[in-house]
Swiss-Prot record:
The keyword RNA-binding does not apply. It comes from Saccharomyces cerevisiae (strain ATCC 204508 / S288c) (Baker's yeast). It comes from the Eukaryota. The gene is CCT7. The keyword Lipid biosynthesis does not apply. Belongs to the TCP-1 chaperonin family. SUPFAM superfamilies: GroEL apical domain-like (SSF52029), GroEL equatorial domain-like (SSF48592), GroEL-intermediate domain like (SSF54849). It is found in: Cytoplasm. Keywords: ATP-binding, Chaperone, Cytoplasm, Nucleotide-binding. This is T-complex protein 1 subunit eta. Molecular chaperone; assists the folding of proteins upon ATP hydrolysis. Known to play a role, in vitro, in the folding of actin and tubulin. In yeast may play a role in mitotic spindle formation. Residues 529-550 are annotated as: Disordered.
Length: 550
């Protein structure tokens, strides 16, 4: 068919599909991301505020951890979800800097917005940002100080990094207490692996935060026990510990079975055989010489009383996570049978005891020779407080872990961002054209961190930033915001330290997220189906193999 000079309209998308594109779409996405950034801004820094979030199921959370807040905010805008993803990635990779990375990404987008409105191609902005971030990372690596070259002990340096991570958290007033706990926890791990999953955290409501305990070994809540456990000893010195994955319980058969017997004696023989089987298992356990028997599966009332008569402590239904950490701490291995257990299959520790902590009883294994694991028992008034203490300790533990692995640190309090910003401004003066403006915009965006730190603390941000620019232009590379004096100062000398990895990861993630948003200029939203079952109903009469009614 001949359409002449006109091109026919071709409809590809079904009716109701929403498609928007062009410069306006990029700006709309930027506005959505900036809205998320504005929600997080007040939480940044040691004097930042906390946010109270009530979820749809009425669960209350109080936190100033960026990743936690974004996870609970239930962000629905597809572009803004990018910020949630980079915050989670930062949390998983380095543990801290989750708020900073979101604020940086939002600010980079905000700085790109005027260029887009003036008609500059988004690809030019992305090219400028990529160049700027590579220069910024190069500068941070140049600034970073190897903590092993410092005169102080390694432990003292790790404590300083942990203290900086805690400065913006709920526990900053108890930092002296929790800093030691964090460093002890990380140093108890295997130096080659540093697997933070082996640090167990148990939350016990009640008491003060400083009643929290560090156990150089394993502690777990007392499992369900049958009658007879009262007679079992609750404390051992240098016990032998047997870990099982065996059910020590006399119970009915799981499968339907039928046994035909001719005489009562035959029935009695079957019953006796069941008892003999369970007693044989119990005798084999006793012969190993173990003082403590742990099992992932239930230990029944018969076994509990059998062990109590022989001064053996037992605990069944121990979680797999706790059991694995027990093995890591006391040695030995988990046995799937009670026969042929050798002495090397048993573990040991200096002290085992069951003790009351708050309203719960806990089993504690201390002084473990193989200890590559530890447990933190956290106390606190309200559940929300303990949950926030756990999140704060997680951030500090990750920071200590990264500092131990990478050993390169920089100063916090906005000092690093100001120095990198000054370096980028100097570089931008050496080039011409649009790239100069874009790199300058990147440098300006970095100043959002010290500016927001000042605003959250109630300081005059304009005055402090002017002082910082002047100090950095004179070569004071570690000058940042000092909260005690409401002024500026050398944050490196004041031990406000952060691993360089936190800054590098935050800059890379924020720039990648910004470039991703800038590269998307079209959004297609498919119309939702009328109902969840639309198109799923069978035609009339087509069910159950019947034909159509006549």
């Amino acid at each position: 068919m001949n359409f002449g000079s006109q091109t026919p309209t071709i409809v590809v998308l079904k009716e109701g599909t929403d498609a928007s594109q062009g410069k306006g779409q990029i700006i709309s996405n930027i506005n959505a991301c900036v809205a998320v950034q504005e929600a997080l801004k007040p939480t940044l820094g040691p004097l930042g505020s906390d946010i109270l979030i009530v979820t749809s199921n009425q669960k209350t959370t109080i936190s100033n951890d960026g990743a936690t807040i974004l996870k609970l905010l239930d962000v629905v805008h597809p572009a803004a979800k990018t910020l949630v993803d980079i915050s989670r990635a930062q949390d998983a990779e380095v543990g801290d800097g989750t708020t900073s990375v979101t604020i940086l990404a939002g600010e980079l987008m905000k700085e790109a917005k005027p260029f887009l409105e003036e008609g500059i191609s988004s690809h030019l902005i992305m090219k400028g940002y990529r160049k700027a971030v590579s220069l910024a990372v190069e500068k941070i690596n140049e600034l970073a100080v190897d903590i092993t070259s410092e005169k102080s002990s390694g432990r003292e340096l790790l404590e300083r990094c942990a203290r900086t991570a805690m400065s913006s958290k709920l526990i900053h007033n108890n930092a002296d207490f929790f800093v030691k706990m964090c460093v002890d926890a990380v140093l108890s791990l295997d130096r080659n692996d540093l697997d933070d999953k082996l640090i167990g955290i148990k939350k016990i409501p009640g008491g003060a935060m400083e009643e929290s305990l560090f156990i150089n070994g394993v502690a777990f809540k007392k499992t369900f026990s049958y009658a007879g456990f009262e007679q079992q000893p609750k404390k051992f010195n240098n016990p032998k510990i047997l870990s099982l994955n065996v059910e020590l319980e006399l119970k009915a058969e799981k499968d339907n079975a039928e046994v035909r017997v001719e005489h009562v004696e035959d029935y009695q023989a079957i019953v006796d055989a069941e008892w003999q089987l369970i007693f044989e298992k119990l005798r084999q356990v006793e012969e190993t010489g173990a003082n403590i028997v742990l099992s992932k599966l239930p230990i029944g009332d018969l076994a509990t009383q059998f062990f109590a008569d022989r001064n053996i402590f037992c605990a069944g239904r121990v979680s797999a996570d706790d059991m694995n950490r027990v093995i890591q701490a006391v040695g030995g291995s988990i046995q799937s049978t009670t026969s042929d257990i050798k002495p090397e299959h048993l573990g040991t520790c200096a002290l085992f005891e069951e003790m009351q902590i708050g309203s719960e009883r806990y089993n504690l294994f201390q002084g473990c020779p193989q200890a590559k694991t530890c447990t933190l028992l956290l106390r606190g008034g309200a559940e929300q407080v303990i949950a926030e203490v756990e999140r704060s300790l997680h951030d500090a533990i990750m920071i200590v872990k990264r500092a131990l692995q990478n050993k390169l640190i920089v100063a916090g309090g906005g000092a690093t961002e100001m120095e990198v910003s000054k370096c980028l401004r100097d570089y931008s003066k050496t080039i011409a054209g649009k790239q100069q403006m874009i790199i300058n915009a990147f440098a300006k965006a970095l100043e959002v961190i010290p500016r927001q730190l000042c605003e959250n603390a109630g300081f005059d941000a304009i005055e402090i930033l002017n002082k910082l620019r002047l100090a950095h232009s004179k070569g004071e590379k570690w000058y940042g915001v000092v909260f005690e004096t409401e002024n500026i100062g050398d944050n490196f000398a004041k031990f406000v330290w952060e691993p360089a990895l936190v800054k590098i990861n935050a800059l890379n993630s924020a720039t990648e997220a910004t470039n991703l948003i800038l590269s998307v200029d079209e959004t297609i939203t498919n119309k939702g189906s009328e109902s969840a079952n639309a198109g799923m109903m069978p035609p009339q009469g087509a069910g159950r193999g019947r034909g159509m009614p006549m």
